[in-house]
Amino acid sequence: MESTIGIDAGGTLTKIAYLNEKKKLTFEKFYSNEQDKIIDWLKKQTSIKQICITGGKAKQLQQLLSDSYKIVELNEFEATLVGVRYILKEEKYDINNFVLTNIGTGTSIHYIYNDRYIRAGGTGVGGGTIMGLSKLLTNIDHFEDVIPLTKVGSRKDLDITVGDIYGGILSPIDNSLTASNFGKAATIESNYNNSDILATVQGLVGEVVTALSLQFAETKNIGHIIYIGSTLCNNIHLQNIISSYTKYQNKTPIFLRDGGNSGAIGALLYATNKKS
């Protein structure tokens, strides 16, 4: 039986969504610079005839696949929205208007009004920042190695909080808020362990991304912010940072179970619906 798959070729990761033999939605993930592994996997799936591809590296991958498959290309923002809408329905959310923050290699932020999306903005701070700083500061360069260390790390010896500055005096804002990411490293000599450094890197990224998302949400008086992206996958530390900061500003954070695969899901659904 001929089949269709969706591919989201991102800056760092390439995600694949397809229906297995039991018609269950299934995912695969590869590093985007490992194109040989992607092609080898595709060759083993002999039933695949059509691929809907999206993402920043879609053109590069498409050039390698166009002779073997029927290729449909889809704008990555459209694919992501289709995927997010599908996941929201599957997870029983009834939300039409929200801010969508996609934390990939960098971070893009959109306003979503029903099935219409408007780009609000973005930042170069994202998953690529986490991995770049992790490599520079600890020489750890695999996301899978960063996550477990981050879980046991602490930011208290590296970040300066509002409470640190006010020193017990009543402050105008919450003492636990970060006044300066990595600020203590400039004034306190210490051999910081990798866990604390990695936790602080994620704190920096999480707070920058959340602050920007909150500003956009507040501008349009939107109450829900949906955070997606592979950077959040199994990353409880980063999710907790984002969640607590979002709630502090009286907005509702939502993390979708398969949010990191939303682009690939959207590509699959688009091609499947178009085919039918």
Curated annotation (Swiss-Prot):
Pfam entry (one): Fumble
GO biological process, one term: coenzyme A biosynthetic process
Keywords recorded for this protein, A-Z: ATP-binding, Coenzyme A biosynthesis, Cytoplasm, Kinase, Nucleotide-binding, Transferase
Full protein name: Type II pantothenate kinase
Species for this entry: Bacillus cereus (strain AH820)
Superkingdom in the source lineage: Bacteria
Recorded metabolic or biological pathway in which this protein acts: Cofactor biosynthesis; coenzyme A biosynthesis; CoA from (R)-pantothenate: step 1/5
Family indicated by similarity: Belongs to the type II pantothenate kinase family.
Catalytic activity field: (R)-pantothenate + ATP = (R)-4'-phosphopantothenate + ADP + H(+)
UniProt xrefs under InterPro entries: ATPase_NBD, Type_II_PanK, Type_II_PanK_bac
Catalytic residues identified in the record: E76 (proton acceptor)
